[in-house]
Amino acid sequence: MAELDKIEVRDITRIERIGAHSHIRGLGLDDVLEARAVSQGMVGQKDARRAAGLVVQIVREGKIAGRCILLAGEPSTGKTAIAVGMAQALGNETPFTSMSGSEIYSLEMNKTEALSQALRKSIGVRIKEETEIIEGEVVEIQIDRPASGTGQKVGKVTIKTTDMETNYDLGNKIIECFMKEKIQAGDVITIDKASGKVSKLGRSFTRARDYDATGAQTRFVQCPEGELQKRKEVVHTVTLHEIDVINSRTHGFLALFAGDTGEIKQEVRDQINSKVMEWREEGKAEINPGVLFIDEAHMLDIECFSFLNRALESDMAPVVIMATNRGITKIRGTNYRSPHGIPIDLLDRMIIIRTVPYSAKEIKEILKIRCEEEDCQINNEALMVLGRIATETSLRYAIQSITTASLVSKRRKAAEITVEDIRKVYSLFLDEKRSSKIMKEYQDEYLFYDDSLSQAEQAMEVETN
């Protein structure tokens, strides 16, 4: 008993890490696409969420391709959060590719190739295939191994359903699959005749009393009914980019695992497009246009915008969502100014969704959700102070202060975060406004201080006055 007392019990470390938007589960809309006040991690921005819900409906129907949506608003107004909510609402079946506007600049790949790959990653292809399977409960399994230990293994298996029972001879390959899956009498299995893949569905209910105790992973299922051999339709979902990589001779399918795909020739893409269209006409495949989300879209230059103008008109284009926090600014690569740093001809093709700054009540609710997500206990007074800090500084600064304040409270072994913890963190870590103020006060003491810039600023102030 003394040895048992010394055993240390530790919690299993969580694999899911807490990110900036990990608390978002969807757009928080009801059945008629009306935005709830607080739902699925989303707070406020009712008009923007309602508009995003309509875009999700367009994507789900899959009939309209090549639409471009711009999420425009001030910093910290939830543009990326809405995009994450859209990805969650669409689910895993719809391809959703997220990238930043600066990701396309690389020495290994040109800009248009990076955009082409991102666009094709966002288009899914559902390929339908009919396969023959054997499905039933294993009654008896017998494997004969050579006495020498080397050589071919042979065996027999008896599989049954509620209506019939059949014996099968097993070859070496299928025996290896059986041993890998640890198949034994009483298991309900499926065998794909084409590929030889063996899948264990669970154990039969009739064998539930075989063991006094079973693991949590043991699943009990009914014995299958009808014929042993059945035809089953299997749907494989792949993206056009994955098909491109597999058919690219210079890389092959191994590049999918390495990630180093390089540039893919346009001829390969044209052949794949024609083949996919052929499958579509024959009913073998369905095209599932997804979503490409480009954050910080003002970082794209004039060449990228020109390429997107042409790409959006293609019938194989996904729905493109861009987000930017810029006002009237220069288009990158030119000296011309434009709203959001995007050319007028591309803006004309866009549907613009505006996000507005959060109210003090909404900021408090967001901070409360973030505290729950980060598993931090906070009292009401501290939450009000944190909300006031978020209003005066920024929402991001307040969210980042939650974790640091939690560490301060744990250090003094407190059960929850208090106002004193928030004050301590506020004094230790500067926000952008206080940092800028200190820079202006002590700018003469910093290296490479440009006095001419300050003189020019003073001259501009004199002119405006």
Curated annotation (Swiss-Prot):
One of its GO terms (cellular component) is nucleus. It catalyses: ATP + H2O = ADP + phosphate + H(+). Its EC number is 3.6.4.12. GO terms for molecular function: ATP binding; ATP hydrolysis activity; ATP-dependent activity, acting on DNA; helicase activity; transcription corepressor activity. It is found in: Nucleus. PANTHER family: RUVB-RELATED REPTIN AND PONTIN. Belongs to the RuvB family. This is RuvB-like helicase 2. The lineage of its organism: Eukaryota, Metazoa, Ecdysozoa, Arthropoda, Hexapoda. The gene is rept.
